[in-house]
């Protein structure tokens, strides 16, 4: 029986080879418009889920620390051909689950759609 369960787990893991749920770097592209020219920028972002377990409620000031997928960011500049105005865009260098900083990040519940594979 254990062999059947292990085979099933390995088969499912193989099916979702491209799926990653943990915090990781992901390549994306998005369009930018400058000088009437539209061009796609290719960059990396942090994506994925961080483990969180709600503890037993004790009081108003005893909330669990929320972890989010974030990392070190830099900014790069791209010049679109035929346009003197440069485009600055963020690039994630690494990602990890860190404490949510409400000063620069929304730490509430995400009400949008979360795809099964990012």
Swiss-Prot record:
Localization annotation: Secreted
Example of a GO biological process term: ovulation
Q: Which family does it belong to?
A: Belongs to the glycoprotein hormones subunit beta family.
What InterPro entries does the annotation carry? Cystine-knot_cytokine, Glyco_hormone_CN, Gonadotropin_bsu, Gonadotropin_bsu_CS
SUPFAM superfamilies in alphabetical order: Cystine-knot cytokines
Function text: Involved in gametogenesis and steroidogenesis.
* Assembly and oligomerization: Heterodimer of an alpha and a beta chain.
Q: Does the keyword Mitochondrion apply?
A: no
Looking up PROSITE patterns in the UniProt record yields: GLYCO_HORMONE_BETA_2
Q: Which residues form the signal peptide?
A: 1-18
What is any one of the record's Gene Ontology cellular component terms? cytoplasm
Keyword set includes Transmembrane: no
Q: Give one GO molecular function term.
A: hormone activity
Q: Which residues are glycosylated?
A: 27
Q: Which UniProt keywords apply?
A: Disulfide bond, Glycoprotein, Hormone, Secreted, Signal
- Gene symbol of the encoding locus: cgba
Disulfide pattern: 23-69, 35-83, 46-95, 50-97, 100-107
What is this protein's record name? Answer: Gonadotropin subunit beta-1
PANTHER family listed in its UniProt record: GLYCOPROTEIN HORMONE BETA CHAIN, LUTROPIN SUBUNIT BETA
